[in-house]
Structures are given as C-alpha cells and as structure tokens.
Amino acid sequence: RVMKMKQLNPRSVRDQIYQVLKEEIMKFRLVPGEQISEKEISERYEVSRTPVREAFLQLSKEGLLEVYPQKGTRVSLIDLDLVEEARFMREKLEKAVAELACEDFPQEAMFKLEQNVKMQELSIAQKNYESLFELDEAFHQTIFEGCGKANVWAAIQQMNVPFQRIRFLRLAADFNWNTIHQQHAALTEAIRTKQKAKAKEIAEEHLQLVIVDKQM
C-alpha cells in the first residue's frame, strides 16, 4: 500500500506517519516481533527519513516499537504484566467514574452513550471488530468526559497501549462480542436510572473480561 504524504509542514508528515504506523501496530497489520525500517517506511510513503525517524521515536516511547541502534527496529512484543497493570488501573478508575456518572451525567453525554450502544449492535451484526473496538473506547471516554474527568482519561492513555492491544486481539478472535455489548447497554441504563451499586458492579465485570491468562 503506497500513500503519498506530501505536506509543507514536516510536523504534519511526522504526525501522519505516526498515526498510520500506530494504527497498523494496534490492529496487528504489523505483528509483534515484525522488523520494520526507516528506509522501507520512507519509500512506502514517499517522505524523507527524518519524519519517519521521529515517528519511530514517539512509538518507541509508547512501547510499540523497540529500536536497536545498528540492529534495526521491530514491533514490540506484548508485555502481559503491563497489560494487567493497565487493566487494574482502569478497573479502579472506571468503577469510581461509573458511580460519579450516576450522581450527575449530562443529557448530551447520555445521548452519546445510547447512540454508541446502538452502533455497537450494528458492528456486531456486520462482524466488524475494528469498529467495535473503536466504539468500545469511545463509550468509556464519553463516561469520563461526561463526569468532567477528561484529563483522567488522557492520563490513562499513557498506560493503556498494551491493554488495548490485547483487547483488539481478543475482539478479532470473536471474544465475547455480545457480552461486551450487553454490559455497555446495562451500564448505560444503570447510569440513566442512577443505580450506583449496579453501575459499579457492571464496570468491574466489564474489565474482568480482559484479565490476562498468562497460559493462553
């Protein structure tokens, strides 16, 4: 796949390369352990090596690439310990935010949740796990933002990458799609009817779906 990225602004080129490579890694088009090179990427997208090198550096900071001077660059393997740490953090924070949402949640945010749940149903019917993955993330982000905790959500993203990679892999394997949708629908209803205990329970169960089995 060749995509030209001719932009006057080098930062824009770097950002585009970064976003494309991140999506390819997160969605396993570039698989863990796969070798990639600055030369290959710069030729594929017809850009100089400088923005590619900068994109590689950013991806390595996020734990998605491992860069070895004089040896090359590869897509990082998934560290299951980091996955479990991220899941643990999200479980604790999402339970707290679910309770907050039951106290006060804007109507506009509630509408977004309801529409999101409907779109998840459509994604499942179409067997579109990439869309379901994106809707899942957007669903949780909407709850945080609706509670005035957008900065907390942004902070979570710093540890969230290994967790997201496992979640995407499991969705691709047709892992509990309907259960995920049902839990989102139930959590939306619990928030709408201000059932704190129920919302907290569902949030915990939802994150328990991705407890890492290190024998898998």
Residues covered by each model-derived region:
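Short linear motifs at protein or domain termini
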Residues: 1-103, 141, 211-216
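Hydrophobic residues in alpha-helical segments
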Residues: 25, 101, 124-125, 147, ...
